[in-house]
Design a protein with these regions (language model features):
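Structural beta-strand segments of beta-rich domains
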Residues: 47-51
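Sec-dependent bacterial lipoprotein signal peptides
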Residues: 1-21
């Protein structure tokens, strides 16, 4: 009889432990908000551009940005997010959101550029990204790498 009561008591305690372990103070029914962000390149004129980005949903803890990079120099399909995220992680500059920068140097007229940004979660993993391709204003081929004005 004592053995039977002991088994019943142990089974009851086991069930209570299972119930307690499955309940937590976190509300699992709360919707998880996936972080999203945007990136916009505007005011493209006379070798300048305005690059802006902001968090739209969710929470992030830091970001990296590539303000402009020639599309012709990218050796992969930037539409594949995993490759783009890795590229920004390796080549980007740490920034905070919201982000705004007026680019006034380094653009070549007529060149297609990509601007890209990624944001990180609390564990340091990239959780969202955004990019935009755009063409620098001006006349293509007007840039000279040499010290001369070219053939006039």
């Amino acid at each position: 009889m004592i053995m039977k009561n002991l088994h019943i008591s142990m089974a009851f305690i086991f069930v209570l432990l299972l119930i307690t372990a499955s309940c937590s103070d976190k509300d699992d029914s709360a919707p998880r908000i996936i972080p999203t962000m945007n990136l916009t390149v505007s005011e493209i004129a006379d070798n300048t551009a305005l690059i802006t980005s902001e968090q739209q949903t969710g929470t992030t803890f830091g970001a990296k940005v590539i303000d402009f990079y020639p599309v012709a120099d990218i050796g992969f399909d930037y539409n594949i997010e995993v490759k783009l995220v890795k590229f920004v992680e390796e080549n980007g500059e740490p920034v905070s959101l919201p982000y705004t920068r007026k680019v006034t140097e380094g653009l070549r007229p007529g060149v297609n550029y990509i601007s890209a940004i990624i944001a990180y979660n609390a564990e340091g993993r990239a959780v969202c990204s955004a990019f935009q391709t755009w063409k620098a204003a001006g006349t293509e081929g007007a840039w000279s790498d040499g010290g001369s004005a070219g053939d006039l």
